[in-house]
């Protein structure tokens, strides 16, 4: 497990990768309840989508969010919306701006 570390005179702040995953998952859940309901999915018949976070030794944070999308949606527009919401929520919670959020589309789901 890696941590984002920020040192100051009083000590250090260490934020676990799990915190960034939790924020991303919470953001995605909210979007799926409201704006992106029936457009974004976290599972298909065979696979569950996951969220990953990596923090390297230089304190660079990368959050990868896997999703399935409805086949009839605008994938670029939807993935940009997801990316922006997650980035904004991470910034609001941590005040860290050096975060990359990657949306990985695992597939498309046809509505029946």
Features from the language model and the residues they span:
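N-proximal, solvent-exposed amphipathic alpha-helical segments enriched in charged/polar residues
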Residues: 5-52
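Short, non-transmembrane amphipathic alpha-helical segments
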Residues: 74-94
């Amino acid at each position: 497990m890696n941590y984002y570390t920020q040192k100051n005179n009083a000590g250090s702040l260490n934020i676990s990768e799990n915190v960034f995953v939790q924020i991303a998952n919470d953001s995605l859940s909210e979007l799926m309840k409201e704006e992106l309901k029936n457009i974004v999915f976290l599972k298909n018949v065979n696979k569950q989508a996951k969220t990953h976070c990596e923090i390297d030794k230089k304190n660079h944070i990368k959050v990868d969010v896997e999703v399935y999308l409805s086949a009839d949606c605008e994938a670029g527009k939807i993935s940009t919306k997801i990316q922006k919401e997650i980035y904004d929520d991470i910034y609001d919670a941590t005040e860290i701006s050096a975060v990359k959020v990657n949306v990985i589309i695992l597939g498309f789901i046809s509505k029946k």
